[in-house]
Amino acid sequence: MELNVFAGQEKSELSMIEVARAILEERGRDNEMYFNDLVNEIQNYLEKSNSEIRAALPTFYSDLNVDGSFIPLGENKWGLRSWYAIDEIDEEVITLEEDDEDAPKRKKKRVNAFMDGDDDAIDYGHDDPEDEDNYPGSVSSEYDDENPDDEKDEVESYDQKSTKLSQMTNWMKRMLI
């Protein structure tokens, strides 16, 4: 295999990431590669021994994940991020989130280590009104995330407090001078 991109360069000076990018670019969008196949082609191109590749493999895999030009496509297949429009990537993420919403959520059963199967023991954990967010005066019952007016009120309240604080600070500075 010969990569025209590296014509005139010494193979020993090339990084595995550079070679991986060149291999994927040459193959094109419809030819994503399994990680193992990609590593084998890199090894063949760079003419490295198995022991050299094994030693460099953890670093290469980390670089592949960190480098922004590669994208994992699932099932250990890799491609170039430039092959995919941002909308395509986002749709895949949204699809996964929608699947999670459809799945029924299981409630976790609370286990009390002190109950130890004793039917006569009193469980004080279920009758504490402070454990519930629905008691009168609760912040969560007054604030509605969906209501933009609540957010506006919160910002105005913060601004008022901030203004008062700066006024007090200025007054204190004048008193000290």
Curated annotation (Swiss-Prot):
Biased composition (Acidic residues): 117-134, 142-157
Tagged with keyword Coiled coil: no
An example Gene Ontology biological process: DNA-templated transcription
Pfam families referenced in this protein's UniProt entry, alphabetically: HARE-HTH
Stored InterPro entries: Asxl_HARE-HTH (IPR007759), RNAP_delta_N_dom_sf (IPR038087), RpoE (IPR029757)
Segments for region (Disordered): 117-164
Quaternary data: RNAP is composed of a core of 2 alpha, a beta and a beta' subunits. The core is associated with a delta subunit and one of several sigma factors.
Family: Belongs to the RpoE family.
Protein name: Probable DNA-directed RNA polymerase subunit delta
Species, as recorded: Streptococcus suis (strain 98HAH33)
